[in-house]
Amino acid sequence: MIPPIANNFVAGETYSEALNHVDELNVRGVSGILNLLGEHYDEREAADADADEYIALAEEIERRNTDACISVKPSQIGLEIDGAFQENLARIVDAANCFVWIDMEDHTTTDVTLDAFEEHARATDGNVGVCVQANLKRTGSDLQRLAELPGKVRLVKGAYDEPGEIAHKGKVTVDAVYRDHLEYMFQAFDDGIAVGSHDPAMIEHAQHLHEEYGTPYEVQMLTGVRESAQFDLANDVPVYQYVPYGTKWFSYFYRRLRERKSNALFAARAILGN
């Protein structure tokens, strides 16, 4: 059972609950990105089981005609198990009749994740997407590589606590780098980009860049964060809500607390019963 403290950020324990949540979003003009919670598996059986669930989830999205896609974490489907990640990702991409996002985890996974994205982006003519993190110092060169590929790229600020020698530190610095990367993406990407941000200033910046360069884009935000703003924004631009579900909620919830002071305050109020 998901405790009340985390329930604001997680859409239930089963994909049926998560899909019901997305159906409600669809009524208000927001699409869904469904993610089964789980990461860093070291047993093949667990990785295969979650890959099987993603395939079943994709089939259910199609059956229900829900406006949604799926997003998978590499370490969840076998990144730390020889051969499992590549095999399970191929199974998911081949079976899914919806768009498939590949999430980015900490810096140790970046190379293998981008390589997997490139392989499937070319094979599917762009029916997959990948996330990159603005706080990593390598992201500028990664974006130059990705600009030559089909598929979408999601830019986020980065939720992992990375070493200072490889990552930008401090909100002002990361915000400036994010803006620079966003401008490059609007100039260089043809297949559209995803702005992963709740920051009104960044979203406004993206709107201005779209007006200047004409590049198609969407905004992606999280369940439980500025949801009223998501519904308002959906009147002007495609909006996707990242919708996690499942029983393995703690690591995801902890990253959300680290990201935003308001999230931590929400958790504190929940603990105190206010």
Where are the regions that the model predicts?
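Positively charged, amphipathic and often flexible ligand-engagement surfaces
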Residues: M1-N274
